[in-house]
Amino acid sequence: MFRWGIIFLVIALIAAALGFGGLAGTAAGAAKIVFVVGIILFLVSLFMGRRRP
């Protein structure tokens, strides 16, 4: 998940540097969403892993 977030962030930075504002905003938004989902899944797996069967 974090890998995809970083990929979208790099795409957003490159698009912003080249002047593609709409694409940069879309890629930055996707990077934020993927990053938040990754954090949530990490926290869920962290707490679920500590439970006893």
Curated annotation (Swiss-Prot):
GO terms for cellular component: plasma membrane. It is a multi-pass membrane protein. Keywords: Cell membrane, Membrane, Transmembrane, Transmembrane helix. It comes from the Bacteria. It is found in: Cell membrane. Its main location: membrane. The chain crosses the membrane at residues 4-24, 28-48. Belongs to the UPF0391 family. This is UPF0391 membrane protein ESA_03375. It comes from Cronobacter sakazakii (strain ATCC BAA-894).
